[in-house]
Swiss-Prot record:
InterPro entries linked to this entry: Flavodoxin/NO_synth, Flavodoxin_CS, Flavoprotein-like_sf, Flavoprotein_WrbA-like
Catalytic activity as recorded in UniProt: a quinone + NADH + H(+) = a quinol + NAD(+); a quinone + NADPH + H(+) = a quinol + NADP(+)
UniProtKB keywords: Flavoprotein, FMN, NAD, Nucleotide-binding, Oxidoreductase
Molecular function, one GO term: electron transfer activity
PROSITE patterns from the UniProt entry: FLAVODOXIN, FLAVODOXIN_LIKE
Protein name: NAD(P)H dehydrogenase (quinone)
Domain Flavodoxin-like as annotated: residue spans: 4-184
Length: 191
Protein backbone atom coordinates (compact mmCIF):
# COMPACT_ATOMS: atom_id res chain seq x y z
CA UNK A 1 0.00 0.00 0.00
CA UNK A 2 1.43 3.36 -1.07
CA UNK A 3 1.89 6.04 1.59
CA UNK A 4 0.84 9.50 0.40
CA UNK A 5 1.25 12.92 1.99
CA UNK A 6 -1.13 15.67 0.93
CA UNK A 7 0.46 18.90 2.10
CA UNK A 8 -1.21 22.27 1.68
CA UNK A 9 -1.33 25.94 2.59
CA UNK A 10 -4.67 27.70 2.92
CA UNK A 11 -5.98 30.88 4.49
CA UNK A 12 -9.66 30.98 3.50
CA UNK A 13 -10.17 27.22 3.36
CA UNK A 14 -10.48 26.81 -0.42
CA UNK A 15 -7.17 24.99 -0.86
CA UNK A 16 -7.93 22.98 2.28
CA UNK A 17 -11.18 21.76 0.68
CA UNK A 18 -9.27 20.66 -2.39
CA UNK A 19 -6.69 18.93 -0.15
CA UNK A 20 -9.44 16.92 1.53
CA UNK A 21 -10.85 15.89 -1.86
CA UNK A 22 -7.37 14.92 -3.12
CA UNK A 23 -6.91 12.81 0.03
CA UNK A 24 -10.32 11.15 -0.47
CA UNK A 25 -9.34 10.23 -4.02
CA UNK A 26 -5.99 8.82 -2.88
CA UNK A 27 -7.76 6.69 -0.26
CA UNK A 28 -10.19 5.54 -2.95
CA UNK A 29 -7.11 4.51 -4.94
CA UNK A 30 -6.01 2.28 -2.05
CA UNK A 31 -3.37 4.48 -0.43
CA UNK A 32 -2.63 5.25 3.20
CA UNK A 33 -2.97 9.04 3.35
CA UNK A 34 -1.80 11.78 5.71
CA UNK A 35 -2.98 15.38 5.27
CA UNK A 36 -0.83 18.12 6.77
CA UNK A 37 -0.34 21.85 6.38
CA UNK A 38 2.75 24.00 6.02
CA UNK A 39 3.56 26.50 8.78
CA UNK A 40 1.70 29.80 8.61
CA UNK A 41 3.99 32.83 8.51
CA UNK A 42 1.43 35.64 8.57
CA UNK A 43 1.15 37.13 12.08
CA UNK A 44 -2.03 36.13 13.93
CA UNK A 45 -3.15 39.75 14.39
CA UNK A 46 -3.23 40.16 10.59
CA UNK A 47 -4.92 36.81 9.93
CA UNK A 48 -7.66 37.65 12.44
CA UNK A 49 -8.70 40.58 10.21
CA UNK A 50 -9.48 38.19 7.34
CA UNK A 51 -13.11 36.99 7.71
CA UNK A 52 -12.43 34.00 5.46
CA UNK A 53 -9.66 32.84 7.78
CA UNK A 54 -11.70 33.40 10.94
CA UNK A 55 -14.44 31.09 9.55
CA UNK A 56 -12.07 28.16 8.96
CA UNK A 57 -9.35 28.77 11.56
CA UNK A 58 -10.28 25.87 13.84
CA UNK A 59 -10.48 23.40 10.98
CA UNK A 60 -7.18 24.60 9.51
CA UNK A 61 -5.47 24.32 12.88
CA UNK A 62 -6.75 20.76 13.28
CA UNK A 63 -4.24 19.65 10.65
CA UNK A 64 -0.76 18.81 11.89
CA UNK A 65 2.06 21.06 10.66
CA UNK A 66 4.42 19.16 8.36
CA UNK A 67 8.20 19.07 8.72
CA UNK A 68 10.36 19.06 5.57
CA UNK A 69 12.40 16.03 6.68
CA UNK A 70 9.30 13.82 6.87
CA UNK A 71 8.67 14.08 3.12
CA UNK A 72 11.15 11.26 2.58
CA UNK A 73 8.87 8.90 4.54
CA UNK A 74 6.19 8.88 1.83
CA UNK A 75 5.92 7.23 -1.58
CA UNK A 76 4.07 10.21 -3.04
CA UNK A 77 3.62 13.86 -2.08
CA UNK A 78 0.83 16.07 -3.39
CA UNK A 79 1.37 19.79 -2.78
CA UNK A 80 -1.47 22.34 -2.66
CA UNK A 81 -1.19 26.11 -2.48
CA UNK A 82 -3.36 29.13 -3.14
CA UNK A 83 -2.34 31.24 -6.10
CA UNK A 84 -0.60 34.45 -5.09
CA UNK A 85 0.20 36.79 -7.98
CA UNK A 86 0.50 33.82 -10.35
CA UNK A 87 2.75 31.67 -8.16
CA UNK A 88 2.50 29.49 -5.06
CA UNK A 89 2.12 31.17 -1.67
CA UNK A 90 5.26 32.31 0.12
CA UNK A 91 4.44 29.87 2.91
CA UNK A 92 4.54 26.90 0.52
CA UNK A 93 7.66 28.26 -1.20
CA UNK A 94 9.41 28.65 2.15
CA UNK A 95 8.52 25.08 3.08
CA UNK A 96 9.82 23.74 -0.23
CA UNK A 97 12.96 25.85 0.14
CA UNK A 98 13.62 24.05 3.42
CA UNK A 99 13.95 20.73 1.55
CA UNK A 100 17.51 21.52 0.43
CA UNK A 101 19.04 18.76 2.54
CA UNK A 102 16.63 16.24 1.04
CA UNK A 103 17.67 17.47 -2.41
CA UNK A 104 21.38 17.18 -1.61
CA UNK A 105 20.88 13.62 -0.36
CA UNK A 106 18.46 12.74 -3.22
CA UNK A 107 15.83 11.57 -0.71
CA UNK A 108 12.82 12.46 -2.88
CA UNK A 109 14.21 11.05 -6.12
CA UNK A 110 11.79 8.57 -7.68
CA UNK A 111 8.87 9.54 -5.46
CA UNK A 112 5.60 10.51 -7.10
CA UNK A 113 4.63 14.19 -7.03
CA UNK A 114 1.58 16.22 -8.01
CA UNK A 115 0.12 19.67 -7.34
CA UNK A 116 -3.15 21.57 -6.94
CA UNK A 117 -4.17 25.20 -6.41
CA UNK A 118 -7.04 27.61 -5.86
CA UNK A 119 -7.44 31.31 -6.54
CA UNK A 120 -10.09 34.01 -6.39
CA UNK A 121 -10.21 35.18 -10.01
CA UNK A 122 -10.95 33.22 -13.21
CA UNK A 123 -7.74 34.49 -14.80
CA UNK A 124 -5.63 34.76 -11.66
CA UNK A 125 -2.76 32.55 -12.82
CA UNK A 126 -3.76 29.04 -11.74
CA UNK A 127 -1.81 27.26 -14.49
CA UNK A 128 1.24 29.43 -13.84
CA UNK A 129 0.99 28.50 -10.16
CA UNK A 130 0.72 24.80 -10.93
CA UNK A 131 3.77 25.01 -13.19
CA UNK A 132 5.75 26.97 -10.58
CA UNK A 133 4.95 24.29 -8.02
CA UNK A 134 6.11 21.52 -10.36
CA UNK A 135 9.60 22.98 -10.90
CA UNK A 136 10.99 22.04 -7.45
CA UNK A 137 9.51 18.55 -7.84
CA UNK A 138 11.46 18.12 -11.08
CA UNK A 139 14.59 19.39 -9.29
CA UNK A 140 14.10 16.69 -6.65
CA UNK A 141 13.88 14.01 -9.35
CA UNK A 142 10.27 13.20 -8.55
CA UNK A 143 7.98 11.41 -10.99
CA UNK A 144 5.28 13.92 -11.89
CA UNK A 145 1.66 12.88 -12.25
CA UNK A 146 -0.85 15.15 -13.93
CA UNK A 147 -4.38 14.60 -15.13
CA UNK A 148 -5.21 12.86 -18.42
CA UNK A 149 -7.77 14.37 -20.79
CA UNK A 150 -11.23 13.99 -19.25
CA UNK A 151 -14.57 15.73 -19.68
CA UNK A 152 -14.27 17.06 -16.10
CA UNK A 153 -11.21 19.08 -17.15
CA UNK A 154 -13.26 21.17 -19.56
CA UNK A 155 -14.73 23.06 -16.60
CA UNK A 156 -12.31 22.41 -13.75
CA UNK A 157 -8.65 21.69 -13.28
CA UNK A 158 -5.78 21.45 -15.72
CA UNK A 159 -3.53 18.78 -17.12
CA UNK A 160 -0.93 20.05 -14.64
CA UNK A 161 -3.08 19.50 -11.53
CA UNK A 162 -6.38 20.21 -9.84
CA UNK A 163 -7.55 23.82 -9.47
CA UNK A 164 -10.52 25.90 -8.42
CA UNK A 165 -11.65 29.50 -8.59
CA UNK A 166 -13.11 30.64 -5.28
CA UNK A 167 -14.88 28.08 -3.13
CA UNK A 168 -14.40 24.72 -4.90
CA UNK A 169 -17.49 23.59 -6.76
CA UNK A 170 -18.50 19.95 -7.11
CA UNK A 171 -16.66 19.54 -10.42
CA UNK A 172 -13.50 21.05 -8.87
CA UNK A 173 -13.70 18.53 -6.03
CA UNK A 174 -14.25 15.68 -8.52
CA UNK A 175 -11.10 16.65 -10.42
CA UNK A 176 -9.19 16.89 -7.12
CA UNK A 177 -10.37 13.37 -6.24
CA UNK A 178 -9.31 12.18 -9.70
CA UNK A 179 -5.83 13.59 -9.08
CA UNK A 180 -5.53 11.87 -5.70
CA UNK A 181 -6.72 8.55 -7.08
CA UNK A 182 -4.37 8.76 -10.06
CA UNK A 183 -1.38 9.52 -7.81
CA UNK A 184 -2.30 6.57 -5.58
CA UNK A 185 -2.53 4.22 -8.54
CA UNK A 186 0.81 5.35 -9.99
CA UNK A 187 2.54 5.24 -6.59
CA UNK A 188 1.23 1.73 -5.98
CA UNK A 189 2.67 0.54 -9.29
CA UNK A 190 6.06 1.99 -8.36
CA UNK A 191 6.18 0.64 -4.80
Amino acid sequence: MARILVIFHSITGNTMKLAKAVADGAREGGAEVAVKRVPETIPAEILEKNPGYVKVREELESFEVARPEELQDYDAIIFGSPTRFGVMSSQMKQFIDMTGRLWMERRLEGKVGAVFTSNEMPHGGKEATLLSMLLPLFAHGMIIVGLPPAKELYRAGSYYGAASTGVPKEDDLQVAKMLGKRVAEVAEKLC
